[in-house]
Amino acid sequence: MSQNIRICRWAKLFSGKNGYFAVFHSLNLEVVFLEQKFREMIELLFLGTTLDFLTRKFEKLAEIAEVIAELSRCGLVVPVENDDLTLLDEKRKIHVLPPGLETLYLIVADDCNLACDYCFILNNMPENYRSRRMSFTTAKVAIDMYFRNLVRNPLGYEKLRKTIYFYGGEPLLNFRLIKQVVEYLEHQYKDQISEMGEKFRMSIVTNGTLISKEIAQFVAARGNFDIAISLDGQEESHNKKRPFINGKGSFEKAIRGLEILKQEGKKEISLSCTIADHNIDELPSLLDLHRKYGFASINLNPLVDTAKDPVSKKYMWKVSKRMIEYFTLAREEGVYEDRMMRKTKSFVEKKIHAYDCQALGAQLVCSPDGQLGVCHEGTGIKQFFFATVDKDFDFHKNTVIAEWKQRTPLNMPQCYDCPALGICGGGCAYGSWLRNGSIWSVDDRFCVHSRTTLEWLVWDLFSRL
Ligand code: SF4
Ligand code: SF4
């Protein structure tokens, strides 16, 4: 007697390319491409059927047993009585782990010498906010607290990458502090840093305009100090959105900073590009900059919601499309954009990407006045900030951090039937809170990007078979 079988809950269909459609498993991340002639068979499998029945009904389709065997191997076809939620539980056990500290953001200055109107830090500041600079006393306590917590990481302190970000506003407005902190780290935590080797990084994202010879030498002398410069493309588009406070464009000064870094021997410099209407149709021009300056990586940042300016779905559709076009072009030159790459890696390696942001249980942010929180976007209004910096603060026992760590599509019933469940990571929790008042709501702005990327990945794979 033939077994009753059906399509499992996690199977998602992508229709129509060159006479084929795709059946994709949103948790195993397996994909099977089938000719359209099997479409009716799949429809019957959604209802539940038997192999005997299918063989009789589609007697002209000689490969039917083979196709069912392949669908079963990938978990796409299961016995009718299968409990599909068991697989979700298994995946959760592997991928939803307790919080584990990896990243510390020190907001060393929350003001800036530029006036970019899309800045998510400045646009989330309360009215009449007075900007601040971090003191060495605050930074030192934060560093001591960070190192005490690193060794407590239940996920294995040695294996994970650990990064201290010097962040702003414009962090180089407080370079004096950065220098003091780095020297303190190199003196006080010399052994730990040497033991961590490549796993320990310091990092800065800067607008580049304040880079002097002294700063460049300081950065270039350290192999574990990463630097990214914000450039939105060629001069005209960059200057439209990234002017100095006096209105003058900042491109020339940013490029000057980049060149000083190069002259002083800094080899690995990254480019960080924010995508808005000024450059959305010109992303390939970033590759011209890459050919000239040889960036270590190019990261594209879609706008995030701010208290003043929510991002529209129309914008996200366009960004998603342009990012895919850019990714396709850039990979021909061996350049892999990070945000797209995280999903691509998950898809190719068939490994669930449960979180797309370190704020979800792996990151701590210290504001200039020494308040601790999970996400730098909340720095101004101190949203999701919960303690004053103290060397005894226990990251791994904090309830806000524990809740954020749980926020993954694997724990969000709204996501269970989404094709992108396994590769998405859930987008931005802070944006979800801003839009809907809860980190547990779906970041629907980001959904557009995840789903569009998944569909592209499926058909990109097909085109390479
Ligand atoms: S929660 Fe959102 S704004 Fe905060 S760090 Fe994550 S992606 Fe960025
Ligand atoms: S956040 Fe959106 S795209 Fe991601 S899994 Fe949930 S519903 Fe799908």
Predicted feature residues:
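Hydrophobic "anchor" residues
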Residues: 31, 372-373
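Long, charge-rich, low-complexity alpha-helical segments
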Residues: 32-105, 140
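Radical SAM enzyme [4Fe-4S]-AdoMet core and its adjacent flexible, acidic
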Residues: 236, 240-255, 259, 263-360, ...
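Radical SAM/AdoMet-radical enzyme domain recognition
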Residues: 139, 143-167, 174-302
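Local cysteine-cluster metal-coordination motifs and their immediate loop/turn environment
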Residues: 111-122, 374-377, 412-430
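Acidic, low-complexity/disordered tracts enriched in E/D and polar residues
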Residues: 1-45
